[in-house]
Amino acid sequence: MTELPDNTRWQLWIVALGFFMQSLDTTIVNTALPSMAKSLGESPLHMHMVVVSYVLTVAVMLPASGWLADKIGVRNIFFAAIVLFTLGSLFCALSGTLNQLVLARVLQGVGGAMMVPVGRLTVMKIVPRAQYMAAMTFVTLPGQIGPLLGPALGGVLVEYASWHWIFLINIPVGIVGAMATFMLMPNYTIETRRFDLPGFLLLAIGMAVLTLALDGSKSMGISPWTLAGLAAGGAAAILLYLLHAKKNSGALFSLRLFRTPTFSLGLLGSFAGRIGSGMLPFMTPVFLQIGLGFSPFHAGLMMIPMVLGSMGMKRIVVQIVNRFGYRRVLVATTLGLALVSLLFMSVALLGWYYLLPLVLLLQGMVNSARFSSMNTLTLKDLPDTLASSGNSLLSMIMQLSMSIGVTIAGMLLGMFGQQHIGIDSSATHHVFMYTWLCMAVIIALPAIIFARVPNDTQQNMVISRRKRSL
């Protein structure tokens, strides 16, 4: 890093700033949801749409981000990403209704979807290959600090200012980032193949409509017949994409990816697994505030052990997988996460609050080990010609499954609760208890998929893949 020119180091700082903004936003909002609900005159049971709208937009836009950067230029797209994210943040802060907030989060999600992948692409273009790993470590470090800082910062802002400030703090940072990008970032472009617009639209429509159909009756009052039509339309769009990809060699995601057994198993397991685990960061601060009566700041602080556990486990997960193999690790961590989630609810309802940080630390560790193992299993056997496409599809599936997970969590709360539930009451405890039991079952189910991972998917495979990528 010290050997790089000054202008390149400044460019890396710009990318790091984008990573920080995007990662901070993924965790800072969850702590503020109960306060948002009160301010907007909404039931807390409907506030999951604030999270779903952002994550689903990121999932939809991810496949187009790399192509746009290559075609239009990394500086232009990164600049546009920061501007859209900043404008979305401003409109979020100005929102007076839930619908306005959801629309503003969609705009914010368009910017967020392009920020991280285009940032990675920028680093590839401006840094010599020999220093690429050091540069990526530098720019992703703020992205690791964001989730750690987000819950506590969100709690402080909500408790001592208002929820609007979790969005307003993005504005000065975004203005500085956009100006620096425009003045300092080179605008690399390359010759690109034709973008698969029909395939992109089919996938986007399918994902959006299916997610809407999953929760439309609760959050939007859509009739059952309309929901059935939406579900059928979404499924038809996905099937049409499969037919399109089968006949089109330039499809957005080639079906040749699924000829690799570990990719198919890993992708299916990642989709199912992240539906369950995606519920936890959303549900935990909501339960701590509404179910237990914690203040926003206290609830935010309680999320820090989970992030610390996740960061700490990343340092040893390779050794664990190499020692026990993918199948054992994935089955054990999947079932373990379900048990830890039940332990969290039991400890909370028993009033043993002093144990909650320890349980959340354990939850973060188990979840991180499972995430890392799922990601590596999915990509490790892909041929080099398909590695980039497979990674893009995995990233899209990760975001989609998390949006579905939050949607299902909101649906479960609505199913067991009423439109307005009291804070720290016996009835509210029952609502969250039943919701957590269902969540534990959903979290455990992917173990059936991971049990099919072949026995030879074991030692040294993580290390060898990492060496190949270097």
Swiss-Prot record:
Main location (coarse class): membrane
Positions on the Periplasmic side per record topology: 1-11, 70-76, 125-137, 186-196, 243-262, 307-341, 417-430
Cytoplasmic side: 33-48, 98-101, 159-164, 218-221, 284-285, 363-395, 452-470
Pfam families linked: MFS_1
InterPro entries cross-referenced by the UniProt entry: MFS (IPR011701), MFS_dom (IPR020846), MFS_trans_sf (IPR036259), Multi-R_MdtD (IPR023721)
GO molecular function, one term: transmembrane transporter activity
UniProt GO cellular component terms: plasma membrane
Topology of this chain in the membrane: Multi-pass membrane protein
UniProt-listed CDD domains: MFS_LmrB_MDR_like (cd17503)
Cellular compartments annotated: Cell inner membrane
PROSITE patterns (alphabetical): MFS
Transmembrane segments: 12-32, 49-69, 77-97, 102-124, 138-158, 165-185, 197-217, 222-242, 263-283, 286-306, 342-362, 396-416, 431-451
Domain of life: Bacteria
Keywords: Cell inner membrane, Cell membrane, Membrane, Transmembrane, Transmembrane helix, Transport
Family: Belongs to the major facilitator superfamily. TCR/Tet family.
Listed name of the protein: Putative multidrug resistance protein MdtD
Gene name for this UniProt entry: mdtD
